[in-house]
Regions:
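Cleavable N-terminal signal peptides of Sec/SRP-targeted secreted and luminal proteins
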Residues: 8-25
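A short, N-terminal "cap"/entry segment at the start of jelly-roll beta-barrel domains
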Residues: 27-108, 173-225
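Conserved short histidine dyad/triad with adjacent acidic residue
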Residues: 94-100, 110-127, 228-244, 278
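Short, conserved beta-strand element in jelly-roll/cupin
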Residues: 115-116, 126-142, 229-232, 242-258
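Extended, compositionally biased flexible segments
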Residues: 121-159
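Long compositionally biased, domain-poor regions of proteins
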Residues: 139-145, 150, 168-169, 233-235, ...
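Short acidic-glycine-tyrosine-enriched beta hairpin
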Residues: 146-162, 262-278
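Ligand-binding loop in jelly-roll beta-barrel domains
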Residues: 149, 156, 162-186, 278-304
Length: 305
């Protein structure tokens, strides 16, 4: 079983092991940073804190020149925090971003991280493009074209239909994960603005599975994608080894585990992003001492032709 081909050279493997040994074991059972970092985590009390402060952070890999956990293949990609390249987001004001998934790799959607600060403001997506924004850190204000305002805290989200005038503003540090897609129109069906939070969405039945599932968007045919929130307790795993036509974009919000993509098996942790092409075999198992939660994009309600 091949996990990381880049670890095949003994000197690099030994050096990486020394990095792991040199840091403290965290409360969730994964090698992590010195105790000062844990003190910060304990004091933060913030949901999804490890998305922006991952256990195995870029600073832990600074003594490994050229090393990254990121992988790009024909039918999947694992994009890890140490390989993010931040730059000003087009059309956004005072906002840095990192595009994690784009059509350049074969997807029909984009997924990016937006890092906002004081006086940051979103731009509008291109014509006929819909947007979904989820807050993983901080707080933002969504203002609609009619002037209605919605305060979005961590774990809150907004779906903006295509050509829907709006702005997302921040008065302080905030991090969003954003999905955008050119909308696939259906006659006599039109999606509407959706604003909500994860915990207010009902748990759904998952026949044959043991994970918990919430869908953040309506399941009606007006919506051509949905966003799933999936929770696994340590030791739980997908029963179905999925192979399907749908594409996925995934952000691990909490926890750690092993993700199978094709014939590769990847250790993953909060902050990691994954792209899954149509028909790539996929499977997940949660490890550690705390739950796994991930956010998952999935195209739905459209004939693949």
């Amino acid at each position: 079983m091949k996990v990381f081909s880049s670890l095949s050279r003994p000197p690099l493997l030994l050096h990486l092991l020394s990095v792991f040994i040199g840091v403290a074991a965290s409360k969730d059972g994964f090698c992590s940073a010195p105790s000062s970092v844990f003190d910060g985590e304990a004091n933060s009390g913030a949901l999804y804190w490890k998305v922006t402060n991952p256990t195995l952070s870029p600073s832990h890999l600074k003594d490994l020149p050229g090393f990254t956990r990121s992988v790009y293949k024909r039918d999947h990609a694992l994009i890890t925090p140490e390989s993010h390249v931040l730059s000003p987001l087009p059309e956004w004001m005072d906002t840095l971003g990192a595009y994690l998934i784009t059509p350049a790799m074969g997807s029909h959607f984009v997924m990016y991280i937006a890092k906002m600060q004081d006086n940051s403001r979103s731009g509008l997506p291109p014509s006929d493009v819909e947007r979904f924004a989820f807050v993983v850190d901080g707080a933002v204000t969504l203002t609609t074209g009619s002037g209605d305002k919605h305060n979005l805290m961590v774990d809150s989200f907004a779906y903006l239909p295509p050509n829907y005038h709006h702005s997302i503003d921040s008065d302080g540090s905030a991090t969003l994960v954003v999905f955008e897609r050119r909308y696939a129109y259906l006659e006599d069906h039109a999606p509407e603005l959706v604003v909500g939070s994860t915990e207010k969405r009902p748990l759904l039945e998952t026949p044959g599975e043991i994970f918990q599932l919430r869908k953040l968007l309506p399941t009606s045919v007006a919506y051509d994608f949905n966003i799933h929130i999936m929770d696994f307790q340590p030791g739980e795993f997908l029963n179905v080894k999925e192979v399907h036509y749908n594409q996925h974009g995934l952000l691990l919000l909490e926890g750690q585990g092993i993700y199978r993509l094709g014939d590769s098996w990847y250790p993953v942790q909060a902050g990691d992003a994954i792209w899954m092409a149509p028909f790539v075999p996929q499977w997940y198992a949660a490890l550690g001492k705390s739950r796994t939660r991930y956010l998952l994009y999935k195209d739905v309600n459209r004939n693949p032709l």
